[in-house]
Amino acid sequence: MNKRKILVPLGDKSYEVTLEAGILNNISEELLKIGITKKRKILVISNEEISNLYGEKFLNNLKDNKFQAKMFLIKAGESYKNLKTLSEIYDVAFEFGLDRNSIIIALGGGIVGDVSGFAAATWLRGIEYIQIPTTLLSMVDSSVGGKTGVNHPKGKNLIGAFNQPKAVFIDPETLKSLPKREFSAGMAEVIKYGVIRDKELFEYLEIEKNKNELINLKNEYLIKIINSSIKTKSNVVSQDEHENGVRAILNYGHSFGHVIENLCGYGKFLHGEAISIGMNIAGKIAIEKGLWSKEELERQRILLESYDLPTEIPKINKEDVLTILMGDKKVRDGKMRFILPKEIGAVDIYDDVEDSLFLKFFS
């Protein structure tokens, strides 16, 4: 049986991630199992692309099983992850009569999940929500851990809340319709888990046969890497839900990734592609500080590139890099904190990195 359940242990906010091929076809049954009764209204939030693939079937499954469900589609793309979209969700929630006993389901990638989770956190001071991620990146990263929010013109995710979902359902079948580039972008986050905490996963991803089966989207192999990634994330989040300490290691590659996304213009690089370049920069800094070997940096680079991810650092202005980094949420008391690798499978947090040490990598 290929059904996996992973507990995210957070006391009274604990929840399960259920991972199974084809689970989307039995969604009503799964909702009943976790206590979602048919009296509760369900607002499904998705986007047009996902809706065209699964939306109608998903909504019909709920309605055929006598759930009171409505679907609202938000526009796709990072530029729509904003307060205007959030306000549109509130309008629909009001018209549909979403009360405190109602529930929001996020059906889509990371943007759908982030916006839906924040809408749930703030509608009537908080209602329950469920994550059903449909991209590899959202499966292994944003759907687990409770980070929700929208962007502000001054930066990504500046408006948000920690809001844990009631449950997460993952169906690797949805990856079959994912563009190849999006799949590769998701692999950046999987490789990240290998570098920060899971040497065994890193080595599994290096094996040629596994690589081929993953690129060919074989469920058994997908379930293995998604399961490993979520276990690592669950373990870290359960120790530090609000990112006051160890949870920051999940941001390996992200500080420089956000710099690249921001300065190259959102859209030039997918999030995972920017993270891949960010991991390469962090790896180079680790060599400058004598933390890990050139061989390990090279293994990381080769693995990223073998999944069609970029590692070359784009030409961007050094002063702009500093400005963006100082606005990073990981800055504490005016000090930038960097997640740097010590070896494959272990990283640490450093706040003693001189500007000159990383600015040399930017033209």
UniProtKB/Swiss-Prot annotation:
Pfam families: DHQ_synthase, DHQS_C. One of its GO terms (cellular component) is cytoplasm. Its EC number is 4.2.3.4. The keyword NAD applies. It is found in: Cytoplasm. Pathway: Metabolic intermediate biosynthesis; chorismate biosynthesis; chorismate from D-erythrose 4-phosphate and phosphoenolpyruvate: step 2/7. GO terms for biological process: amino acid biosynthetic process; aromatic amino acid family biosynthetic process; chorismate biosynthetic process. It catalyses: 7-phospho-2-dehydro-3-deoxy-D-arabino-heptonate = 3-dehydroquinate + phosphate. One of its GO terms (molecular function) is 3-dehydroquinate synthase activity. Zn(2+) binds at residues 189, 254, 271. Disulfide bonds: none annotated. Keywords: Amino-acid biosynthesis, Aromatic amino acid biosynthesis, Cobalt, Cytoplasm, Lyase, Metal-binding, NAD, Nucleotide-binding, Zinc. NAD(+) binds at residues 134-135, 147, 156. It comes from the Bacteria. It is an enzyme of class 4 (lyase). Its main location: cytoplasm. Its cofactor is Co(2+); Zn(2+); NAD(+). Signal peptide: none annotated. Binds 1 divalent metal cation per subunit. Can use either Co(2+) or Zn(2+). Belongs to the sugar phosphate cyclases superfamily. Dehydroquinate synthase family. Catalyzes the conversion of 3-deoxy-D-arabino-heptulosonate 7-phosphate (DAHP) to dehydroquinate (DHQ). NCBIfam families: aroB. This is 3-dehydroquinate synthase. It comes from Prochlorococcus marinus (strain AS9601).
